[in-house]
Amino acid sequence: MANELKQARGKLEQSTVKKYELLTNDTIELGGGITLFRIKALISFGNVKKGELGGYVEKEGNLCHSGDAWVTGDARVTGDAKVTGNAKVYGNAKVTGSAEVTGNAKVVGNAEVCDNAKVSDNARAFGNAKVSDNARVTGNAKVYDNAEVCDNAKVSDDARVTGNARVTGDAWVSDDAWVTGDARVTGNARVTGDAWVSGDAKVSDDARVTGDAKVTGDAWVSGNARVTGKAKVTGNAKVSDIAEVTGNAKVYDNAKVTGDAWVYGNAKVSDDAWVSGSAEVYGNAKVTGNAWVTGNAWVYGNARVTGNAKVTGRAKVTGDAKVTDNAKVYDNAEVTGDAKVSDNAKVSDNATVSGNAWVSGNAKVYGIAKVTDNAWVTDDAWVFDNAKVTGNARVFGYTNITGNANVTDNAKVSDNVKVTGR
């Protein structure tokens, strides 16, 4: 018992021993009656030697006498700010307001921690970084260059916030994520995993960027949108609402992915294209130009939707099919294989265009009609009902192929002819 009391008394004495003093002959006047005092070590501790000069504090409450915490160089700790634990503040760094630097954290260079902000654990703030308001920088996180973390934002784990980046609002950057350049992460946004947000990109609202995803350039991810996997959103692209871009998908240029849309696999959406509604674009599909894929439409495989084309409803464009120019595919229609729909052509209802077929001009294919093989329907021709155009057949002019008619082989139907069948 005696030994235990002796040890306890020793620890108490050690904890109350002052490790530094305030020098009254080396001060800085800040105005408003505030004086800062340089500190001098009274004992050796950590890497600090007895007699070593430190930085400046306003009062002893700014730097804890226990632990190895230290302020050195021309660093300043003022107001109700605290440096505790084994934390280090040095260079020209400033810790002000009611801020706290604790644990093994370091605040270096011209960095500033102010207001009610806290830098803890093994976190680092250096360069011209600023951590303010109620922000938290924890774990092994680093905030540096001219980066700023403010409001209620958090940066944790091994995350990095660099360059001129800002993390604001209730945003959280964690894991091994990077936010750099002039990027902004705000609102309730989360950037996690190995994600990268750079350039002038923005991640806002309740958006999530995670995995190995990259959001760069002037891209904007907002709403409840998700960018995950190895996906890339670049240029002036926008992903919003509850849309998701994942896998190895890329959305770039001025493209938009909105609504409940899903772009995944190796799909690419570029130029001024728009994928919206509950549409899905996946596989190796590409949506480019001013094309629009919306509703519950699916574009997949190696399909291409380009120009001013529109794919809507529950339509499907798949295989190596192409829908281009001002063409429209809608309702439950399907364009598949190596088929092509171009110009002002329309494919609707439950119609199918497949094989190497080509529907062009102002042609219309609808009902449960089928155009397949190497068939070609063009000009103002209409193929509808249960009609079929197959083989190497050609249908053009103002022709109507209707009923159960079957135009096949090398047949050619033109002018104002109407072909019907029972």
How should each PLM-predicted stretch be described?
Residues W70-K418:
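Intrinsically disordered, low-complexity repeat regions of secreted/extracellular protein precursors
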Residues T420-R422:
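Low-complexity/repetitive intrinsically disordered segments
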Residues M1-S66:
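Terminal amphipathic alpha-helical/low-complexity segments used for targeting or macromolecular assembly
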